[in-house]
Amino acid sequence: MSEANDYSYNIASVEKTIRLIELLAETNGELSVLQIAKRLDTHASSAVRFLITLQNLGYVDKCEQIGKYRLTDRLLKIASNLIVSHPLTVRYLDVMHTLAYNLNATTHIMAFYGLSTITLHKDLQTQNISYNNAFFDPKRQHYCSAPGKLLLSTLPEEQLSEYLSGLKFIKYTSTTITSEKELRENLELIRHVGYSVHNEEWLSGCLTVSFPLRVYGEIRGAMSIMCSIERKDEILSPETLSEIKRMLAEPDV
């Protein structure tokens, strides 16, 4: 991810428009003009002008029955275009489907953004509903997730310490990591071996292995492979791991 520009001047109207879009996305459009104005720390008349502009551009709809606003599917169209042209899609989508077929496993491509993992693609080869739902459970924490731990392993110490300072460990299963010391040791292992493992730490019966996805040498996301824990020895065999790493290796530039 590119660094923010050092240029310190922001256009206030653009900044407020982006904040408005983010606000509507967070609340699913359940806000009135007065609520929006309060959240944006602006006058109601200003909030109305921003909303009308976004309506005219096709980004916002108003429910006349309740007088509240929501985002339209136009943003979904933009997101869809972004996913199609995303470098992780261009470079790794075919590999994801190939791995799912070859290993008879569920596979996911996730992008990393800050402390977030964003699912771009999935191939539910195993057709396991629990495996699918596990990736989208809002209660799930990075410390008990293979892609989450992989993300944590890439953070500089300052960001990792900030994450840990607000973390409350919960023991979901008998193998869940429950201390900072144990987590840091696991992250160091991930950096050493080049992949992360979910060993029933969140979902019993599930093995997940996540590998870093690089774009121009920078880790931008993860390829995750999910299957039954009974296949642990097979998936974590040196031969299988080596082949997966070979398939995910970034070509020489």
Regions found by a protein language model. Name each.
Residues 2-83:
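N-terminal helix-turn-helix
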Residues 70-166:
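Amphipathic alpha-helical effector-binding/dimerization core
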Residues 10-14, 33, 68, 72, ...:
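Short, structured helix-loop boundary elements
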Residues 25, 152, 156, 245-253:
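Short amphipathic alpha-helical signal-transduction/dimerization elements
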Residues 39, 93-102, 193, 250:
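Amphipathic alpha-helical regulatory segments at dimerization interfaces
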Residues 60-62, 109-110, 213:
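A structural signal for short hydrophobic beta-strand segments in well-ordered beta-sheet cores
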Residues 175-249:
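Extended hydrophobic
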